[in-house]
């Protein structure tokens, strides 16, 4: 078994692994380098969950616990040395959304809250020089966080269809019937003049940073990878097409760079359906755009919204129910959990059936945020917690909450 999700021939094969040929011949059986690449990107998404402050008694609820410099290492991402976080992304919504998506400090808290309107929604990162050597190019990653609470949001979210024009750029004229999910689009495009963190929308924050990085590395071979899980997967889908449709994957027109537009790939896990068939056609019309959707058998979220919406991505089907390490049948929670998804990717055997870990991925991670492992494994459920829940004894002998570094 490979000892690291970053080992293998990724540097030499990155265009193929990034979807240049729509992953033809790579999914069944699942190519080892592609498997490793998916796991690495999945860990970059998992870092958004492991770094998110979900303690509503904290004035920093809804923010990131860590700073740019230590987020990936503190969250345990194996690619921590291969990427540097360059920007945090914050989101709000112009529509009412479930608490599972925007988590805010308790109204009764005495210390001033960091924000009453916004949440930390992810980050932009770029490959370090070490990462370039491992990846074969300067990869820009946009990682979107999903929900942190129950799955009840699938029944409560606003599934009203609205025109997809805001993310289709000039292609909107050729695709006037393309529609997307109003709730997802609202979180992606909303700003709030009263919020310090969302005077610009999440969309504008990301596009500005991607353009800055494309300018900085205009003479290098680059790629853009947009990743997310659950609701974050929906935002990643909107973001990926938006980047291409509005030319953010191109070197700046004012530069003398000879580099062509770089490929943009969305790698998403457990994604709800974002748009209709016309949106899928619009998505497919961009030659530099690809999307791969990892979908677990039995997970209900990819079936929502149930009517009028379709999946735009190439599907990689997995089944965690085949794993001999996990309880079977799984629960709604475990079948949707990202760490369980990554466990499934590590062992998926496709049409051959069965389950075999092809990379050395610790099975204990499956219990990181849920109760998925069989009882014979000595791993407590939901074991990922900050030491003393971020309570620290100060020099004066009093305990205080230290749960943020950088906003």
Curated annotation (Swiss-Prot):
Pfam families: Lipase_3 (PF01764). The active site is at 230 (acyl-ester intermediate), 230 (charge relay system), 299 (charge relay system), 336 (charge relay system). GO terms for molecular function: phospholipase A1 activity. InterPro entries: AB_hydrolase_fold, Fungal_lipase-type, PLA. Its EC number is 3.1.1.-. GO terms for cellular component: cytoplasm. PROSITE patterns: LIPASE_SER. GO terms for biological process: lipid catabolic process. Belongs to the AB hydrolase superfamily. Lipase family. Acylhydrolase that catalyzes the hydrolysis of phospholipids at the sn-1 position. This is Phospholipase A1-II 7. It comes from Oryza sativa subsp. indica (Rice).
């Amino acid at each position: 078994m490979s000892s690291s999700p970053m080992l293998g021939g990724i540097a030499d094969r990155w265009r193929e692994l990034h979807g240049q040929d729509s992953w033809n011949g790579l999914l069944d059986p699942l190519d080892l380098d592609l498997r490793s690449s998916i796991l690495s990107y999945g860990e970059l998404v998992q870092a958004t969950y492991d770094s998110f402050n979900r303690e509503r008694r904290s004035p920093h609820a809804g923010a990131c616990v860590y700073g740019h410099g230590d987020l990936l290492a503190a969250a345990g991402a194996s690619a921590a040395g291969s990427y540097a976080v360059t920007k945090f992304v914050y989101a709000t919504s112009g529509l009412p959304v479930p608490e599972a998506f925007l988590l805010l400090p308790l109204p009764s808290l005495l210390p001033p809250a960091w924000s009453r309107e916004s949440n930390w929604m992810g980050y932009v990162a770029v490959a370090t020089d070490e990462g370039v050597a491992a990846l074969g190019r300067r990869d820009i990653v946009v990682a979107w966080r999903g929900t942190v609470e129950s799955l009840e949001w699938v029944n409560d979210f606003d599934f009203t269809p609205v025109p997809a024009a805001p993310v289709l750029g000039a292609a909107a004229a050729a695709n006037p019937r393309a529609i997307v999910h109003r709730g997802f689009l609202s979180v992606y495009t909303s700003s709030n003049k009263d919020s310090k963190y969302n005077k610009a929308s999440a969309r504008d924050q990301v596009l500005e940073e991607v353009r800055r990085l494309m300018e900085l590395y205009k003479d290098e071979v680059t790629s853009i990878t947009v990743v997310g899980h659950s609701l974050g997967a929906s935002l990643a889908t909107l973001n990926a097409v938006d980047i291409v449709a509005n030319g953010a994957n191109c070197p700046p027109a004012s530069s003398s760079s000879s580099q062509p537009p770089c490929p943009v790939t969305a790698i998403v896990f457990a994604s709800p359906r974002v748009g209709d068939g016309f949106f899928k056609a619009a998505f497919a019309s961009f030659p530099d755009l690809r999307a791969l959707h990892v979908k677990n058998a039995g997970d209900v979220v990819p079936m929502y919204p149930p009517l009028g919406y379709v999946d735009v991505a190439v599907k990689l089907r997995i089944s965690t129910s085949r794993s001999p390490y996990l309880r079977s049948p799984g629960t709604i929670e475990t079948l949707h959990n990202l760490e369980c998804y990554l466990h499934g990717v590590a062992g998926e055997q496709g049409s051959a059936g069965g389950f075999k870990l092809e990379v050395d991925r610790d099975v204990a991670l499956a219990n990181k945020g849920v109760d998925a492992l069989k009882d014979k494994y000595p791993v407590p459920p939901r074991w990922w917690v900050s030491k003393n829940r971020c309570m620290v004894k100060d020099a004066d002998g009093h305990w205080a909450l230290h749960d943020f570094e950088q906003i």
